[in-house]
Amino acid sequence: MTFSLFGDKFTRHSGITRLMEDLNDGLRTPGAIMLGGGNPAQIPEMNTYFQTLLAQMLESGKATDALCNYDGPQGKTELLALLAEMLRDELGWDIEPQNIALTNGSQSAFFYLFNLFAGRRADGTTKKVLFPLAPEYIGYADSGLEEDLFVSARPNIELLPEGQFKYHVDFEHLHIGEETGMICVSRPTNPTGNVITDDELMKLDALANQHGIPLVIDNAYGVPFPGIIFSDARPLWNPNIVLCMSLSKLGLPGSRCGIIIANEKIITAITNMNGIISLSPGGIGPAMMCEMIKRNDLLR
């Protein structure tokens, strides 16, 4: 038996698959110490909250509705409206439900986005994903349908007291050319925990606008939720930014709920990809998120 080129690429060893296998083994091996990637910590108070919430949703029938029905390919309609309203009210963003799509985890969201904006084009050109900082998240490395889809830039390193240091974007040497299809940065960065400053993010946004390409922000750990961030950082979104969020680091990795906030053209593309690849995103995570927003608990 032989595979296609697609099969050859996606059946070979990958760092992120090994990481997830190690994570699974670690969860089921008492006493294992996770020195690599890990399952989000199970905080007893959060587990109690989720158990209570799910029990109430079962009692009311909302959990059954979520499990026994498809949502549309854009995601749960109720959540799209509630989340857009919350972000308008809390952050002042000019955002509507048509600016949001859900995916089966943010990992699949980045697979969609990388291959939407990078790779071969109809005119014969090839675009790449630019990471303005390195190191970056290992899960990006094998997400391209084509080889050599990614290019990264060497950072400036600021030396701090007591042996600490901080990564910064080296804007003087950052190259954005015709071959650049999108800029991508995680904030905070996985695995270093580095947080790109507000000024750096604004500069990247300006450069992306100048070159007519999107700035994609991986916000899995960031603000406004789940807020696992310990420095000053302001949430940023506009129609040229693609902001990717997740319920995983909120404590619900098993819900596989990714959130993409973008302009309507991108959301329409993601919706179509969802329909073709997975019919629709899973419903239980979005149903829980609806209840958290209604109770004013999501940002608490």
Mark where each language-model region is.
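Short, solvent-exposed loop/turn segments at secondary-structure junctions
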Residues: 38-42, 107-108, 136-139, 188-191, ...
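Conserved core of the PLP fold type I
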Residues: 65-211, 216-238, 242
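A structural signal for well-ordered alpha-helical scaffolds and beta->alpha junctions
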Residues: 16, 47, 75-80, 201, ...
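N-terminal "arm"/small-domain region of PLP-dependent enzymes with the aminotransferase-like
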Residues: 1-74, 85, 89, 211-213
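Conserved core segment of the aminotransferase class I/II
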Residues: 126, 237, 243-300
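Residues at alpha-helix caps and immediate loop-helix transition turns in enzyme cores, especially N-
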Residues: 46-50, 196-200, 226-229, 254, ...
